[in-house]
Amino acid sequence: MSDILTVYGNLFINTKGANKMKVLIIGAHEDDIEFRNAGMTMKFKELGHDVRFLCLCNGNGGHHILSPEETARVRKGETQQVAKILGVQYDIWEDVSDCEIEPTLENRKRLTRYIREYNPDIICTHRINDYHADHRATAQLVQDASYLLIVPHFCPDAPAMKEMPVIMQTVDAFKNPEFRADVVIGIDDEIETKLECVRCHRSQIYEWLPYTKGETVPESEEERREWMKGMDITADTTDEEVLAAKRGYSVRFAQVAARFRKELIEKYGEEKGSKIRYAEALMLSEYGKQLTDENKDTYFPF
């Protein structure tokens, strides 16, 4: 007896074992993607779907001591560690320098060709309102390419996609306009691996970012691990305590759950949703295929 297929647009879901979806997560810098979407990536991978990361610059500006060339080399090595942990292909535009991503026509064509070649069902990237010019430019490039993905005469050397992908924007704390959590994902089961991915970016979390904030980093590895987390998040830690905390990556990921507690309860129910400690969140872009009540759980089945 053949397996039953449920069809949503161009997405075929095998109800006894899903056909692969393709998920493309586009970030400006090495670390942007896993800091925001490592938990979701693990959930997609566990279900047998394919996830690819694309970074639009080489990160060579992210250090205060190393040369740009050495910084790019170190950061590429850090991404390779993450790729191994998560089991993803992690591509980098190595010819683009940090702080120099531009939403040019040339880059629009380059990104359009890349997306068409991969043919993803879902794209995730930054929002346009962001403090960093590279984040804004990356978001602008994705937005500019979105409709063109299905236009055959634009970049005719790369076959146009048959249907636009769902385009999602990754969580941030900016207020103008404020982030809206259209998709929330509890990641308590994935948090330790996500923190392991964060620790891969040693040049950033222990060197460059503390330097920019005037922070002193402990010397021993054990102390660094605790310092990096910021605080212990337990079942008794309240959302108010989490939101009041000032630093740390455990705190950062717990604050997403605290901010969007209402949405987590709506999705998972009161008993489970109220207890989720760590979460990731996504905002739907109006420039891609739209999520509906009928297809939302198909695209985000966790």
Feature locations, PLM:
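Short mixed-charge
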Residues: 149-163
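Short acidic, glycine/proline-rich loop/turn micro-motifs
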Residues: 63-66, 178-182
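Conserved acidic residues
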Residues: 89, 121, 165
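A mobile, often basic/glycine-rich helix-loop segment
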Residues: 132-152
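A structural motif
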Residues: 161-177, 197-198
